[in-house]
Amino acid sequence: MKSLGRHIIAEFYDCDKEMLDNIDAIEFHMKQAAYETGATIVNSSFHRFLPYGVSGVVVISESHLTIHTWPEYGYAAVDLFTCGDHVDPWKAFSYLKKIFKSQRAHVVEHLRGKYDEVGIPENAPHKAVEAEMAEIF
């Protein structure tokens, strides 16, 4: 079934606690995860909380990647929302699971804007992504 976007909601457990509290590493790896999907990064913003924890967003032309960490519990909540057929959010999931040294994860995928529910013909191209890609090339 075609959709405007794919939204992966991931929970990473038993992660490297030091990694989850390192804002520079988190930002670097979230950007790298975006590149892994084939996405185009527009902007990013990250914040470190005291005494610990990091939250951040990587805005991509195709939507966004977000993270919230609880280093004291070895836990990270991650959303990977991508639009268009040329990006694969599962590549970001696999990359982050490895980088965070997550011993277990819970993940669900939600199709956003299903063509049949929005009223888009099944063979219609994704206009927003096509327009954005035209600007790049």
Curated annotation (Swiss-Prot):
BP GO annotations: spermidine biosynthetic process
Query: Residues at site: Cleavage (non-hydrolytic)?
Result: 62-63
Q: Which residues carry this modification: Pyruvic acid (Ser)?
A: 63
**Task performed by this protein:** Catalyzes the decarboxylation of S-adenosylmethionine to S-adenosylmethioninamine (dcAdoMet), the propylamine donor required for the synthesis of the polyamines spermine and spermidine from the diamine putrescine.
- Subunit details for this protein? Heterotetramer of two alpha and two beta chains arranged as a dimer of alpha/beta heterodimers.
Q: Which cofactor does it need?
A: pyruvate
Family label: Belongs to the prokaryotic AdoMetDC family. Type 1 subfamily.
Q: In which pathway does it act?
A: Amine and polyamine biosynthesis; S-adenosylmethioninamine biosynthesis; S-adenosylmethioninamine from S-adenosyl-L-methionine: step 1/1
UniProt keywords (A-Z) are:
Autocatalytic cleavage, Decarboxylase, Lyase, Polyamine biosynthesis, Pyruvate, S-adenosyl-L-methionine, Schiff base, Spermidine biosynthesis, Zymogen
Checking HAMAP family in the record gives: AdoMetDC_1 (MF_00464)
Organism name: Fervidobacterium nodosum (strain ATCC 35602 / DSM 5306 / Rt17-B1)
Gene this protein is translated from = speH
Q: How is the cofactor bound?
A: Binds 1 pyruvoyl group covalently per subunit.
EC number(s) in its UniProt entry?
Answer: 4.1.1.50
RNA-binding is among the record's keywords: no
What is known about its processing and modification? Is synthesized initially as an inactive proenzyme. Formation of the active enzyme involves a self-maturation process in which the active site pyruvoyl group is generated from an internal serine residue via an autocatalytic post-translational modification. Two non-identical subunits are generated from the proenzyme in this reaction, and the pyruvate is formed at the N-terminus of the alpha chain, which is derived from the carboxyl end of the proenzyme.
Tell me what reaction this enzyme catalyses: S-adenosyl-L-methionine + H(+) = S-adenosyl 3-(methylsulfanyl)propylamine + CO2
Gene Ontology annotations for the cellular component aspect, listed alphabetically? cytosol
| MF annotations from Gene Ontology | adenosylmethionine decarboxylase activity
| Residues of the active site | 63 (schiff-base intermediate with substrate), 68 (proton acceptor), 83 (proton donor)
- InterPro entries per UniProt: AdoMetDC_C, AdoMetDC_fam_prok, AdoMetDC_N, S-AdoMet_deCO2ase_core, S-AdoMet_deCOase_pro-enz
Q: Does the keyword Cell division apply?
A: no
What is the protein's name according to its record? S-adenosylmethionine decarboxylase proenzyme
